[in-house]
A protein has these predicted regions:
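Iron-sulfur-associated redox domains of electron-transfer enzymes in respiratory
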Residues: 1-218
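General structural feature for long, well-ordered alpha-helical segments within catalytic domains
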Residues: 8-12, 241, 267, 328
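Short alpha-helical basic/polar micro-motif
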Residues: 93, 239, 243, 321
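Active-site-flanking alpha-helical
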Residues: 100, 246-250, 324
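Ferredoxin-type iron-sulfur electron-transfer modules in oxidoreductases and energy-metabolism complexes
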Residues: 211-233, 251-343
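Basic (Lys/Arg-enriched) interaction patch that binds polyanionic ligands
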Residues: 232-252
Length: 343
């Protein structure tokens, strides 16, 4: 266990940035999101959650795949270069780290997504324990311990100082790179912090949600349930829930005429949009109820059934906070428990 004095935090970013890019929670106009760190950036390690998850460090909201050029009858296809620079994502919370693990299941399974794989190979995650979890948090439901994030490096902010523990080879390499700022220390204060965090988690309103019955065995029962017919009605199909979610991985692929050729890129999409699964023979999900049901069945039934019980939700609470119609995965789970829900 190491400690970095609070007056050395800026020096820490400067030292890390000497040989790698840094992505950190940056306050821009009152909103905190993960962004590339530059000298003078207002890094915010106090705000619990960024507005969007930091998943776009590995799965960008938009990325070029390749460009096609035509010269007479000759067509040249120029693939986009894969990520080859090292980078650090600093300050991820345990739920968002688990979100990356979910993305790994999707993009690192065969056929491997080479763009995602290149970023994962180059990226080091420095996670920050949640000092004071909020009422919308329910990561405990999915087996996540926000007091002890499982990343390359786990850190804790205690009394303004940063406590640092490397957990992987990547973490050890980064630890060596910043060794001049580290002071060896015991873990007494960190253990006390963990105890305090876990005590808060136990009192959160959604910490003891039951996932009983949400598995592959319940597919037909849940799919055919009349609960969906009423539950979906407030949905505006805005897609906000999918864009702030750490685990949503749906994307579209589009072509853009640059004037000098055609650029193919992919960008995030949303299963809540009417044209998401549109096909030539018209077999897309035609109603908002079907799309709403698909989103939550995927997270709670289909994904765990196909991925060794891993749910495609990490309990970050962003959908609880951001949905303009107060619809979210908590309300879905509670509706099937016949418990209602006030959010």
């Amino acid at each position: 266990m190491y400690k970095i004095a609070k007056e050395n935090l800026t020096a820490l970013f400067q030292l890390m940035a000497a040989e790698r890019d840094i992505y950190a929670p940056v306050n821009n106009g009152g909103q905190v999101n993960f962004a590339a760190w530059t000298e003078g950036a207002e890094v915010d390690l106090d705000t619990l959650k960024s507005v969007k998850s930091p998943k776009d460090a590995f799965f960008p909201q938009s990325e070029n795949l390749y460009t096609c050029y035509k010269d007479g009858k000759k067509i040249t296809i120029q693939p986009e270069e894969l990520r080859h620079e090292d980078f650090v994502v600093f300050g991820m919370k345990a739920c968002d780290v688990k979100g990356v693990e979910v993305l790994d299941k999707v993009f690192l399974s065969e056929p491997v997504d080479t763009f995602y794989a290149a970023r994962r190979a180059r990226g080091t995650i420095v996670a920050l324990a949640c000092h004071e979890p909020e009422e919308t948090c329910f990561c405990k439901v999915f087996g996540i311990d926000c007091a002890e994030p499982a990343a390359d490096v786990a850190t804790w902010m205690v009394e303004g100082d940063l406590y640092w523990k490397a957990l992987t080879e990547k973490g050890e390499a980064l630890t060596k790179a910043v060794a001049s700022l580290l002071t060896e220390t015991d873990d007494a204060k960190v253990e006390a912090e963990k105890t305090a965090i876990r005590a808060i988690v136990e009192k959160l309103p959604y910490s003891n949600l039951s996932l009983e019955g949400w598995n592959g065995d319940a597919l037909t029962e849940k799919f055919d349930s009349p609960v969906w017919e009423e539950l979906y009605k407030p949905c505006l199909a805005c897609g906000t829930c999918t864009f702030v979610c750490p685990t949503c991985q749906c994307y579209d692929i589009k072509d853009y005429d640059t004037g000098h050729g055609v650029q193919r890129y992919r960008c995030w999409d949303s299963c809540m949009y009417s044209d998401f699964t549109m096909m030539a023979h018209g077999n897309n999900r035609t109603s908002q109820m079907q799309r709403f049901r698909q989103r939550f069945m995927h997270k709670l039934v289909y994904f765990p059934a196909n991925n060794d019980g891993m749910y495609s939700c990490v309990g970050c609470g962003r959908c609880v906070e951001k949905c303009p119609a107060s619809l979210n995965i908590v309300k879905v789970i509670k509706a099937f428990e016949n418990q209602g829900g006030d959010r």
